[in-house]
């Protein structure tokens, strides 16, 4: 990782933003570029809901919300949800979708570091899913998420492990062979080993509670959670009590 860190207001890779801006209009197309996100969302939502003891009545922040797939589903569970993203077009899509579906979600265009400076310890649950591998300084994002959650609150991360298998599965397989996501979506150099993510967590008030893998079976075309964090994985952490 670069020793020279971007400022908190600019922990943004504009090339990454441009990728998602270009396809934002198709965010809610169940057969489009974001089909895998729609497919895994019930697993993500179930994991978050179960591990946090339910979302009803809780204040939730979704960091890197994109077009709002996870944010909207958490709002449907009865949470008061704020979605953060630096992409203008994805947020416009998310806002329009919320109006059409009658689901109330507040969408904000700012970095998580900027949000943490104004809203420290204000959320019961913070989610940061499939986002860390798209920013210049993921460690800074982890720290900001820790600042945003209330004492004894829950923070969830998901990302991709960095190894040969994840390159084969997430880049070669998903982008070039199965064409599940657009070519160039992922850069294996930006993938994050679980040990790296856990070391950043240990620098904060957060403590690891559970880690699980997210697995795809190309034969049955299904996803499931289970042991093994070689490729995609999700991490549940909890903030220390006050």
From Swiss-Prot:
Keywords: Methyltransferase, S-adenosyl-L-methionine, Transferase, Ubiquinone biosynthesis. It is an enzyme of class 2 (transferase). Signal peptide: none annotated. It catalyses: a 3-demethylubiquinol + S-adenosyl-L-methionine = a ubiquinol + S-adenosyl-L-homocysteine + H(+); a 3-(all-trans-polyprenyl)benzene-1,2-diol + S-adenosyl-L-methionine = a 2-methoxy-6-(all-trans-polyprenyl)phenol + S-adenosyl-L-homocysteine + H(+). GO terms for biological process: methylation. S-adenosyl-L-methionine binds at residues 44, 64, 85, 129. GO terms for molecular function: 2-polyprenyl-6-hydroxyphenol methylase activity; 3-demethylubiquinol 3-O-methyltransferase activity; polyprenyldihydroxybenzoate methyltransferase activity. It holds the Pfam family Methyltransf_23. The keyword Zinc does not apply. The keyword S-adenosyl-L-methionine applies. Pathway: Cofactor biosynthesis; ubiquinone biosynthesis. Its EC number is 2.1.1.222, 2.1.1.64. CDD domains: AdoMet_MTases. Disulfide bonds: none annotated. Belongs to the methyltransferase superfamily. UbiG/COQ3 family. O-methyltransferase that catalyzes the 2 O-methylation steps in the ubiquinone biosynthetic pathway. This is Ubiquinone biosynthesis O-methyltransferase.
């Amino acid at each position: 990782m670069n020793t020279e860190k971007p400022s908190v207001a600019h922990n943004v890779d504009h090339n990454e933003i441009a990728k998602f801006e270009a396809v934002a209009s198709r965010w809610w197309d169940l057969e489009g570029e974001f089909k895998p996100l729609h497919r895994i969302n019930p697993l993500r939502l179930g994991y978050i809901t179960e591990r946090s003891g339910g979302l009803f009545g809780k204040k939730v922040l979704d960091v890197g919300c994109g077009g709002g797939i996870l944010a909207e589903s958490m709002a449907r569970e009865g949470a008061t949800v704020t979605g953060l993203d630096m992409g203008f077009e994805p947020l416009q899509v998310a806002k329009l979708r919320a109006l059409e579906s009658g689901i109330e979600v507040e969408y904000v265009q700012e970095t998580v570091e900027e949000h943490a400076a104004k809203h420290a310890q204000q959320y019961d649950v913070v989610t940061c899913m499939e986002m860390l591998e798209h920013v210049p300084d993921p460690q800074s994002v982890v720290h900001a998420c820790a600042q945003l959650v209330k004492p004894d609150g829950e923070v969830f991360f998901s990302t991709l492990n960095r190894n040969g298998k994840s390159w084969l599965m997430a880049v070669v397989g998903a982008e070039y062979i199965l064409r599940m996501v657009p070519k160039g979506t992922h850069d294996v150099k930006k993938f994050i080993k679980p040990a790296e993510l856990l070391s950043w967590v240990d620098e904060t008030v957060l403590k690891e509670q559970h880690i699980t893998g997210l697995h795809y079976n190309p034969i049955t075309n299904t996803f499931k959670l289970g042991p093994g964090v070689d490729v995609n994985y999700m991490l549940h952490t909890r903030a220390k009590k006050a």
